Amino acid sequence: MKRFMLFFVLCSTLLMACEPITPNGDQYPVVSADDYYWYNGEKIYLERGNQEYIIYDDALLSEMDKQKLEISESDSYLEEPNLKWGITKPNTVITDLEHVLYRMPSYTSEGTNFFVTHSFLVKLKDSDDLPILQNMAEQYNVKIVKEELFPLWYLLVCNLPSSSNALDIANRFYESGKFAVSEPNFMGGLVLHN
């Protein structure tokens, strides 16, 4: 029995340490149980890409790490003049993590990366539901920004100390059953560079 247990522990350890590798040496795409969003009542799973969407302090992030970004832009929703968002180059490791304030992996579809930004959309079931939205926004430490074009729709933005990322929080809002729609804000169409 002891030999069986030892064998089981060793095999389990080896299996956990293995990474799935394609014949040409690349890592197989990862699909995580946590990487999904809701669309029209259907759970849509996402396949991870090889880049990251980050929010960083432009004044403090090292120049070496800034050169690893494909895109670097300011965002009015960040409210801090030194904060910017950026997209890392494929398979890049940002070493100055202390000054990266928000990170989200990319996802891929047919060779094109797309990203979940730091924001998500929520549609109220009724205009009287605004206090419910405000309460949940406070609970998850996200900021509400009113979308003027569509009634009952609100854009919410993850603050830097938010309890999680925009994908996870959008899912939690939807799964609460308190809102008609809650879905992440995607940014995409960036072709992978090999």
Language-model features: locations:
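Long, structured stretches of catalytic cores involved in phosphate-ester chemistry, encompassing
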Residues: 1
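Primarily auto-inhibitory N-terminal propeptides
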Residues: 18-194
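Sec-dependent N-terminal signal peptides
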Residues: 4-14
